[in-house]
From Swiss-Prot:
Belongs to the tRNA nucleotidyltransferase/poly(A) polymerase family. Bacterial CCA-adding enzyme type 3 subfamily. The keyword Iron does not apply. Mg(2+) binds at D40, D42. Homodimer. This is CCA-adding enzyme. Signal peptide: none annotated. GO terms for biological process: RNA repair; tRNA 3'-terminal CCA addition. Its EC number is 2.7.7.72. It comes from the Bacteria. It catalyses: a tRNA precursor + 2 CTP + ATP = a tRNA with a 3' CCA end + 3 diphosphate; a tRNA with a 3' CCA end + 2 CTP + ATP = a tRNA with a 3' CCACCA end + 3 diphosphate. CTP binds at G27, R30, R111, D154, R157, R160, R163. The lineage of its organism: Bacteria, Bacillati, Bacillota, Bacilli, Bacillales. It comes from Listeria monocytogenes serotype 4b (strain F2365).
Length: 393
């Protein structure tokens, strides 16, 4: 049995010893059945939150309104959630009310897909009222109950369906795909932040190309930031070899290269990306458009290692030669990598000249930077001083 389950087993045992039901549920059970890596576990129980808190010496009310208590066991923290049913969904994401219950099956009934609605007890026996194991065996993503109801409850489940297709290389069952297509407009009610998370997970999957093809088939792109009417661009984007991707930034660079938005900055901001990512992708965009494989010395210098590495990564994804080693060698051979590497500063110029500060200081440093970069002058203080015409003291 997987070590992650064995380590968490005392949590289940304490709950069952106290007279309650307790199970591992959700993605960890699914991934165990698929022989995938398991990083953490979710635990569901018939014990109500206050009852859970009485059983464990250390607990935290991390999501008690929805039945979740975090407990500490053997110096590890585990989320324990009470079986529950949910009322109507008012915003296509959150239920209007949550009712704690004692029935495992009723709890599993509210979950998104049958493969995620399997529970495993302390003896590692499975409870599978919705035939999730069969769906896994058939490599099928099938909604629990009516797919239309599950998507209406939380519209993000539609993106999760496409993401799971990519990650697991599964297919959607006919009813689930039909509901996905008929209710796709509900995705507009989902926050961009949640969409971005699912998009990245989808792109990191082994079947990203098929996932994008399904996404286009159901017109999901209409409700993704900046991708409305970009079907042909996304088809091109999907055709590249994304299994060669090593960074998240290459996904965003690839997307802007395919879509060619008028304002790259605004396009990336619409996805709510970190400023650091936006700046890097924006800087790399023009070079990536040219599919630059050879770099002049000043181009390498002004681009910087992060940019040329990212451009090279996208080139490889797009089927070009991997020039990372060659370009890295050329970059490392540069006499300087930024103006900060110069052997002189503005203070030196003021001292040597005896003049007051002004625009001339920056202009002179720029001149020295160009001189050093072109090997016209060595990056040594005394040589630079002579080169600028200042006499030895």
């Amino acid at each position: 049995m997987n070590d992650v389950f064995l380590k968490a087993l005392p949590v289940l045992q304490k709950l069952t010893t106290a007279g309650f039901e307790a199970y591992f549920v959700g993605g960890s059970v699914r991934d165990y059945l698929l022989n995938r890596t398991i990083s953490d576990v979710d635990i569901a129980t018939s014990a109500f939150p206050e009852e859970v808190k009485e059983i464990f010496q250390t607990s935290y009310d991390t999501g008690i309104a929805h039945g979740t208590v975090t407990v500490r066991e053997n110096n590890e923290f585990y989320e324990v959630t009470t079986f529950r049913t949910e009322g109507t969904y008012e915003d296509f994401r959150r239920p209007s009310e949550v009712t704690f219950i004692r029935s495992l099956e009723e709890d599993l009934k509210r979950r998104d897909f049958t493969m995620n609605a399997i529970a495993m007890d302390e003896h590692f026996a499975l409870q599978d009222p919705f035939s999730g194991q069969l769906a896994i065996q058939n490599k099928e993503i099938k909604a629990v109950g009516k797919a239309s109801e599950r998507f209406h409850e939380d519209a993000l489940r539609m993106m999760r369906a496409v993401r799971f297709l990519s990650q697991l290389d599964f297919e959607l069952d006919k009813e689930t795909e039909k509901a996905l297509e008929s209710q796709i407009e509900l995705l507009q009610h989902t926050s961009v932040e949640r969409i971005t998370v699912e998009w990245l997970k989808m792109m990191k999957g082994k079947a990203a190309k098929r996932a994008i093809e399904l996404l286009l088939k159901v017109k999901m792109e209409t409700y993704l930031p900046g991708l409305k009417d970009e079907k042909s661009a996304l088809s091109e984007f999907a055709s590249w070899d994304w299994e060669k991707r090593t960074t998240e930034e290459s996904i965003w660079l690839g997307l802007v290269v395919a879509v060619k938005p008028n304002n790259v900055n605004a396009f990336l901001k619409a996805w709510k990306l970190p400023n650091k990512t936006i700046q890097l992708v924006n800087k790399a965009y023009q070079d990536a458009l040219k599919m630059k494989e050879t770099w002049l010395k000043d181009e390498l210098y002004h681009a910087g290692k992060a940019v040329f590495s990212l451009v090279n990564e996208l080139n490889v994804i797009r089927g070009k030669e991997n020039n990372q080693h060659k370009v890295s060698q050329a970059y490392e051979a540069l006499p300087i990598h930024s103006k900060k590497d110069l052997a002189i500063t503005g203070a030196d110029l003021l001292k040597w000249s005896g003049e007051s500060a002004g625009p001339w200081v920056k202009e002179t440093l720029d001149k020295v930077e160009c001189g050093v970069l072109s090997n016209e002058i060595n990056n040594e203080k005394i040589q630079i001083k002579r080169w600028l015409g200042y006499h030895e003291e």
